[in-house]
Amino acid sequence: MIAWRLPLCVLLVASVESHLGALGPKNVSQKDAEFERTYADDVNSELVNIYTFNHTVTRNRTEGVRVSVNVLNKQKGAPLLFVVRQKEAVVSFQVPLILRGLYQRKYLYQKVERTLCQPPTKNESEIQFFYVDVSTLSPVNTTYQLRVNRVDNFVLRTGELFTFNTTAAQPQYFKYEFPDGVDSVIVKVTSKKAFPCSVISIQDVLCPVYDLDNNVAFIGMYQTMTKKAAITVQRKDFPSNSFYVVVVVKTEDQACGGSLPFYPFVEDEPVDQGHRQKTLSVLVSQAVTSEAYVGGMLFCLGIFLSFYLLTVLLACWENWRQRKKTLLLAIDRACPESGHARVLADSFPGSAPYEGYNYGSFENGSGSTDGLVESAGSGDLSYSYQDRSFDAVGPRPRLDSMSSVEEDDYDTLTDIDSDKNVIRTKQYLCVADLARKDKRVLRKKYQIYFWNIATIAVFYALPVVQLVITYQTVVNVTGNQDICYYNFLCAHPLGNLSAFNNILSNLGYILLGLLFLLIILQREINHNRALLRNDLYALECGIPKHFGLFYAMGTALMMEGLLSACYHVCPNYTNFQFDTSFMYMIAGLCMLKLYQKRHPDINASAYSAYACLAIVIFFSVLGVVFGKGNTAFWIVFSVIHIISTLLLSTQLYYMGRWKLDSGIFRRILHVLYTDCIRQCSGPLYTDRMVLLVMGNIINWSLAAYGLIMRPNDFASYLLAIGICNLLLYFAFYIIMKLRSGERIKLIPLLCIVCTSVVWGFALFFFFQGLSTWQKTPAESREHNRDCILLDFFDDHDIWHFLSSIAMFGSFLVLLTLDDDLDTVQRDKIYVF
């Protein structure tokens, strides 16, 4: 039994010895080596070369050491393994070095250089040894070159530009130490050429240093780069008061927007990329101090609080002017020979005290007309209106019942439906024709705009805030600064926020939106007081005063500021809709307010208006997710855009007196036959037709542009549609106002001029394009620029300042545009 086992044991021992002989080298060559000297040696599976280096390390001076290796034999298998053993660290790498790219592509590098991580010393001076071991499993000799150099410019200095070269297999890193009194610096890296793509990383002074393409993202902060990169570094994030600036060239350029290189279709065959070298320059400069933060915040508050001060001064002046006017009227009433009468509803012969807040006509046509024209003829009615008698406008029953003011009652008139058709389809309409409903009912109807948008704001803003906080947390934890598209050359961090200045500059939207709400509140209080006094101007003159839409506009402006600030916490492609959602709201509400001025009875309800805006936001989300280069999406959207334009045009042209049912096509053919074929006649409502034709031309053109060009920024394209329609309607309104013989008073005229100028400057700064998520993060950083205001705010921050002021001014224009009609009877105010 034992006899046959003995030869088996001998055979097993011999086999193990033969394998050990193959795996373990028989010779070890150890030699003392020197810096700045090139060693050309051979190595094989039976030989290990060990090089011993020593150098003096001092506590107050940091010196870099760089190992350069070049393998002269181009062989596919059995690479050389280099192991650098230091006091507190070990670095190993193989040559040829193989790095992986996208889709597991392999790239081969024959020449490799690595900078050694320097362990600290507590002694004043210390001699440290390190060893370079060279081994391989190749049975044949492999020739290599080894050189160890000192890096003289290893420590970067504040304000000094340093230029160097690097490749994917020859990464570079340098050390920076915070000077006394400096709490924050900005590391700027530039290059004259965009490619090859590179990565800039900021890492703590620890060993090992992650300086290869496949591990540079493991620790610290990093961002890809073409021509420009910048990272703001704070002392509080680095306990050692120092950090490494690591620069790595990537194996491929796709991360920076470049194309993939040609790759042979050979399985597991690495590609020799040759010489992908990049020349870069690094500059470390001091970032802004805490005084700049305080100055920026005070500047921002000062600008917008000055509007509050100006508003208070104007309110005081207006109050003084009204008191003076009241005093003069009292003197006139005391003097019978003056011939002026008190302009109150109960001062007209035969007129009853005010009841029910109805408007649109006078209870006693003859008496009230004479009194009003006489009292107002001296000033505000000096320009011409068509002289029409009010006798034809007989008294109407008041709708004063308090039984119900539900939404179902909004369209309730005391007239029969046929009378509604007769009134609203007249060729020439006045505001009195479309201001016949109960004022209390309309007041509640338009208040719903405010309460709905307040509810929408809460439910929309809370998840947005939560999401952007998560974005910022991910950026801070992972260090990946490619997630957010900042202007890194002017991004000032505060706490966990990476770009506090971009958030602070949105304060204007909130403060000016609040100021607008206060102005509307004051106007509403004054109007209600006038109603309680039975002031005839408030009861029967001017554009009917409904403030619900104004409250909604002010709330939307405040929410735009909040959501824009949320977007700028981490601006990128996926959350840009946060910045634009309430812009759609503002554009829609402004158009509704313009329409409501002359059509108070037939304006859209809050539910239908917000439902339409919700559909717009829904398409905005679809465009962000599916619209990029998707032809089918653009076809569907363009068709819906054109159909919606036609339906809205029909609704506006016929003042809502049409029906979308199964007989619509028959009625269309009938109109075409009677008005175009049988008898060619012009449109009944020429002014409305001109506006709608222009609107259709613009919207069809925008739809064609979107279908042909398919812009990547769908949210901005959708916003452009809304803004173009708003500007068209606003211009039409002003032109028709002047064409109707009305005038624009001084304050709204100043608001129009100043707002137009501010919008012009705002758009100039908006189109500077400091970053764009339509490109890769590295390409976006090519557009980054330094701060231009107080060394704290950039061009986009100035856009925030100016656009908030311009929006506030635009709201004031809408508020005051028809102040000249406050003493004009409503059946002398044209509808257009």
From Swiss-Prot:
InterPro entries: SID1_TM_fam. Glycosylated. It is found in: Lysosome membrane; Cell membrane. The modification Phosphoserine is found at residues 401, 403-404. Glycans are attached at residues 27, 54, 60, 123, 141, 165, 476, 496, 572, 603. Disruption phenotype: Knockout mice demonstrate a statistically significant departure from Mendel's law, but there is no significant differences in their weights or appearance as compared to wild-type controls as newborns. At 5 weeks of age, male mice show reduced weight and size as compared to control animals. This phenotype is not observed in females. Mutant animals exhibit increased fasting glucose levels and impaired glucose tolerance, probably due to impaired insulin granule exocytosis by pancreatic islet cells. It comes from the Eukaryota. It is a multi-pass membrane protein. GO terms for cellular component: lysosomal membrane; lysosome; plasma membrane. Its main location: membrane. Keywords: Cell membrane, DNA-binding, Glycoprotein, Lysosome, Membrane, Phosphoprotein, RNA-binding, Signal, Transmembrane, Transmembrane helix, Transport. Residues 315-447, 521-546, 627-631, 710-715, 768-796 are cytoplasmic. Mediates the translocation of RNA and DNA across the lysosomal membrane during RNA and DNA autophagy (RDA), a process in which RNA and DNA is directly imported into lysosomes in an ATP-dependent manner, and degraded. Involved in the uptake of single-stranded oligonucleotides by living cells, a process called gymnosis. In vitro, mediates the uptake of linear DNA more efficiently than that of circular DNA, but exhibits similar uptake efficacy toward RNA and DNA. Binds long double-stranded RNA (dsRNA) (500 - 700 base pairs), but not dsRNA shorter than 100 bp. This is SID1 transmembrane family member 2. It comes from Mus musculus (Mouse).
